[in-house]
Each structure stands twice: as C-alpha cells, then as structure tokens.
C-alpha cells in the first residue's frame, strides 16, 4: 500500500514539475531580460519589458563601442566600433521614442552587468582586449537577434515591427561583419 501511495505521489510530483517548468514548455520563449514570453500576442507589460531591455542593450553597446575607441589600436575594431555606436544610437532613439509614445518608462543607462564588463575589459591588455571585446559584442548581438526575432513573430504593432525589422537587419549585418573581423585578428 505504501508503495502505491509513494508511486502516486512521485507521478504527481513529476507531472507538476514537467508541466510547470518553463524550460520544458514548448509554447514559450525566453527574451532578453530572462522573462518568459508565452506564445501569442504580447501584453503591455511584455512590450514594456522588451522595449526597456532593447533600450538598455543599445546603451550597453554604445558604451562598449566608446571603450573600444579608447582602448583598441586595431583600425578594423575602431571602424567597427564607430559604426556600432552610430547604428545603436539611431536604434536607441527609435526604441526610446516608441516607448515614450506608449507612455512607458524609458531606461537612461546601460545594464549594471555592462558597467562591470567595461571595468573588466578596461583592465585587459591591448591584445586580449580586442578578442574579449569581440566575444562580448558577438554574444550580445546573438542574444539581441534572438530577442528581436521573438518579438517580431509575436507582435502585430506596426510601429514596433518597423523598428524591430530595421534593428534586426543592422544587428545581423554587424554580427556577420564582427565574426569575420574577429577571425582575422592577429
């Protein structure tokens, strides 16, 4: 009798764990800030969270581009960093304007984690800096591409879609350029 009760309890526990574990659910995606977005149209909180993360990410990359312009002597890195800063400043402005238009709060600085990353990277030797900087930007771009695609597939907001599509195209292009640049580092 005890075995049956334990078996039933174990099966119930396993069922609840699998059904409620977001990593096991097939109808969800994790976006940017680690918050889970369930399939379907995003609600206002999800859009606000997406926009806040997109804005902070653009601040992150502008700050990292500024660091590269100070720390690197590699002409390709310097050129890429300038393009990155210009492109993300434009994207940042577009995301901020949309968030403000929707009455959503707008972050005014980068993520705290990025401040720590900037501090760590600034301590790197010049040779190590270029490679570590490229790795960080590639990782950020990969995540950004995933977040943009996820929201693009979920929203029907025409203004948001327009900004996402522009940002997605430029982010993908920069990701590809930076991969090539990193592979050719001395």
Regions found by a protein language model. Give the residues of each.
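Sec-dependent N-terminal signal peptides
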Residues: 7-14
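C-terminal motif of bacterial Sec signal peptides marking the signal peptidase cleavage site
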Residues: 15-19
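His/Met- and acidic-residue-enriched segments that coordinate or traffic transition-metal cofactors
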Residues: 2-7, 20-186
């Amino acid at each position: 009798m005890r075995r049956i009760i334990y078996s039933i309890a174990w099966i119930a526990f396993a069922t609840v764990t699998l059904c409620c574990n977001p990593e096991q659910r097939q109808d969800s995606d994790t976006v940017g800030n680690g918050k889970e977005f369930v399939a379907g149209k995003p609600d206002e909180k999800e859009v606000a969270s997406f926009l806040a993360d997109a804005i902070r990410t653009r601040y992150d990359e502008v700050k990292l581009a500024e660091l590269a312009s100070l720390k690197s002597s590699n002409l390709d890195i310097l050129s890429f960093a300038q393009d990155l800063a210009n492109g993300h400043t434009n994207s940042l402005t577009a995301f901020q304007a949309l968030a403000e238009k929707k009455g959503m709060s707008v972050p005014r600085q980068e993520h705290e984690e990025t401040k720590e990353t900037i501090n760590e990277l600034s301590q790197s030797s010049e040779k190590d800096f270029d490679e570590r900087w490229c790795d960080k930007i590639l990782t950020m771009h990969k995540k950004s591409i995933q977040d943009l695609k996820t929201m693009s597939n979920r929203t029907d907001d025409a203004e948001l879609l327009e900004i996402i599509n522009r940002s997605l195209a430029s982010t993908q292009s920069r990701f590809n350029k930076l991969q090539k640049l990193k592979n050719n580092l001395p």
